[in-house]
Regions:
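Sec/Tat signal peptide C-region and signal peptidase I cleavage site
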Residues: 16-22
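Contiguous mixed-secondary-structure segments that line small-molecule binding/active-site clefts
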Residues: 73, 83-180, 217, 231-336
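Paired acidic/hydrophobic, glycine-rich loop segments that form the ligand-binding mouth/hinge
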Residues: 77-83, 186-187, 203-209
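Positively charged n-region of N-terminal signal peptides that target proteins for export
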Residues: 1-4
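Bacterial N-terminal signal peptides
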Residues: 7-15
Length: 336
């Protein structure tokens, strides 16, 4: 009897030890600058914290976003950090924070991301595609995207007609919106869209301040270029995982970590935006700003009807916008 009890106790102890071992997982991290980039460095901080949630993280840097996504699809990674525009295929709710004009300031983006990652939205963070389960385990802001032009004479959207505009090929919203203003959409990838601007293949490009120095946008601007000082959309990165490869409750702990680090990320973005030389910044009149807001609103509502954006997230973003700017024309309108 004593031997039996001893055997059971030993078995239980072994079982407990096995369950206490950290789950070893591979995470692909897209960063154009590889290990030296800000996104990869943030992932390193996150990986250290993840040890406390029962996961042993192996980070795999990827400088090509398509490769990171394909590696995730092929099962070479258990999770992937990539831009929300590409991650939208896994979760439309989280991926729609990047909607055109959806979060026109970093403060609004912070509110929207905080709400999305809150525990009350945990169910919306999980999706099932093709019999496979995915979960959004984090959202990180990369900052507002601004339009850069090679010639400052292109000082209005009307003057963009006929001009070549680099767009990310996998984001239908960009292509549709560029065509709506009469410009020519030049299909590109995140690895070459700024290069096309710098070498003169396109006249216009949209990018966050985050990309200004690393991608050398100043080369494309030269002495005659400009930046519309008007945020077109908020660029974010999503962290997508296969939850069955991680300890129970991991996703929410990870999301809480991202929320905690939002102020630090927003402060960094504000510094980067302030760092763009004033000589390039083209300030718009209040009248033009309202006109462009209306244009983006119409485009956003159209994209939602087409199924590109998530209607629930559009409602979240509108509430965030109107909580910051209650006097905005759209706050008294229905439709989102």
């Amino acid at each position: 009897m004593k031997k039996t009890i001893l055997s059971l106790a030993t078995f239980a102890a072994i079982g407990f030890a096995g369950s206490a071992q950290a789950a070893k997982v591979d995470i692909c991290v897209f960063d154009l600058l590889g290990k030296s980039g800000e996104s990869y460095q943030m992932a390193q901080e996150w990986a250290l914290a993840a040890k406390g949630w029962g996961a042993e993280i192996n980070l795999i840097p990827r400088q090509d976003e398509a490769v990171a996504d394909n590696d995730f699809k092929a099962g070479k990674c258990d999770g992937v950090f990539m831009t929300a525009m590409r991650a939208r295929q896994y979760n439309k709710f989280a991926g729609s924070i990047d909607a055109l004009g959806g979060a026109p300031s970093n403060a609004i983006a912070q509110r929207a991301i905080t709400f999305a990652l809150d525990q009350r939205n945990a169910a919306k963070m999980v999706s099932n595609l093709g019999g496979k389960k995915y979960e959004v385990a984090g959202i990180a802001p990369l900052g507002s995207a601004f339009i850069f032009v090679k010639d400052k004479k292109i000082d209005s959207i009307e003057k963009a007609a006929g001009k070549k505009f680099a767009v990310l090929g996998y984001d239908e919203a960009q292509k549709i919106m560029v065509q709506r203003v009469g410009a020519q959409a030049v299909v590109s990838d995140v690895s070459n869209f700024v290069a096309k601007f710098n070498n003169g293949q396109v006249d216009m490009v949209g990018a966050p301040a985050y990309a200004y120095k690393p991608l050398e946008i100043y080369k494309g601007l030269g002495t005659n270029g400009a930046m519309f000082n008007f945020p077109v959309l908020q660029v974010t990165a999503d962290f997508i995982i296969r939850p069955d490869q991680f300890p129970a409750g991991f996703g929410q702990k990870s999301r809480d970590w991202f929320v905690k680090h939002l102020p630090k990320s927003i402060a960094m973005i504000n510094r980067l935006e302030a760092g763009i030389p004033a000589k390039y910044k083209l300030n718009l009149s209040a009248e033009d700003k309202t006109k462009y807001q209306k244009l983006l609103r119409e485009g956003r509502m159209d994209m939602t009807k087409r199924g590109i954006y998530d209607a629930g997230m559009m409602s979240v973003l509108k509430k965030a916008r109107c909580s910051v700017d209650k006097a905005n024309f759209e706050c008294s309108l229905s439709g989102e």
